[in-house]
Amino acid sequence: MKYFVVALALVAAFACIAESKPAESEHELAEVEEENELADLEDAVWLEHLADLSDLEEARGFFGNTWKKIKGKTDKIMLKKAVKIMVKKEGISKEEAQAKVDAMSKKQIRLYLLKHYGKKALQKASEKL
């Protein structure tokens, strides 16, 4: 329970940090107006908002690329695990198992692994009882 509370507190803290914006003074907005020849204060706020968005896009791009790399590596690991399990479970050669796994979609591979490890976990739990 305390892990849940700590996780909830961290999420709330990050949400507050993400929502907080630096204080904008009228002087800073006037400088932006002069630089961009803006007549309206709302246009200056809009330009500052666009400047903040570029930073967010850079961060989103970094985390998006990192996520894609992690996902690619886990997909490769799942393929290898599925082949090993098929070889051991069905007693077929590695090439035959690889051909079967290649014919399966990613979703089917995930389901196959979940079934295998789910049965394994259920057996271990029943042994403990």
UniProtKB/Swiss-Prot annotation:
Reported tissue expression: Expressed by the venom gland.
UniProt entry keywords in alphabetical sequence: Antibiotic, Antimicrobial, Cytolysis, Hemolysis, Secreted, Signal, Toxin
InterPro entries per record: Latarcin_precursor
Keyword Ion transport carried by entry: no
Subcellular location: Secreted
Gene Ontology cellular component terms for the protein in this record: extracellular region
Record-level Gene Ontology MF annotations: toxin activity
Functional description taken from the UniProt entry: Insecticidal, cytolytic and antimicrobial peptide. Forms voltage-dependent, ion-permeable channels in membranes. At high concentration causes cell membrane lysis.
Protein name: M-zodatoxin-Lt8j
Gene assigned in the entry: cit 1-9
